[in-house]
Amino acid sequence: MRNNKQKGFSLIELLIVVAIILIIAAIAIPNLLRSKMAANEASAVASLRTYNTVIVSYSTTYGTDPSLDFSYLGPATTPSSTAADLVDSLLGAANPSKSGYNFTYTPGAVSNGIISQYSINAGPQSSSTGQRYFFTDQSGVIRQTTNGNPASSSSTPIG
């Protein structure tokens, strides 16, 4: 008499397990992506706050705002007006990018050789890294848009 009892899983059982795993993944992955996007947006806001703070520090120390780009705030062996060592190399690059956001510094009006106004824009690198655009200026107020256009001084302040 032969024993036909085989040990293991049938194809149907394996397909059911795979289907359950796919259903769980379909539920979890969008939530993870939204969480990553929210973290990128929070990082962009924190970076704008950092820029506002270090521009005030730079202005107090050197008597002017950075004249061209963020590299003036960046790392240095010996701090100077062209490399103040106020931010890390990510934020101190000429055209910084951090956590899926690109930052743009625009110096404004010059009075007696001193820049009295500036603006900073933060825009997502793609729609998967963030949906909100941010703006700040010498007032320190951070503003946002969600319509796909860069934020400006007339945009809604963040809460």
Question: What do these predicted ranges mean?
Answer:
Residues 1-11:
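N-terminal leader/signal peptides at the extreme start of proteins
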Residues 15-31:
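Alpha-helical hydrophobic helix detector
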Residues 24-27, 39, 61:
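Residue-level signal for short amphipathic helical patches enriched in basic/charged
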Residues 31-48:
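Aliphatic-rich helix starts adjacent to a transmembrane/signal segment
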Residues 53-131, 136-139, 146, 156-159:
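Extracellular/periplasmic head regions of type IV pilus-like filament subunits
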Residues 148-152:
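A short acidic/small-residue loop/turn micro-motif
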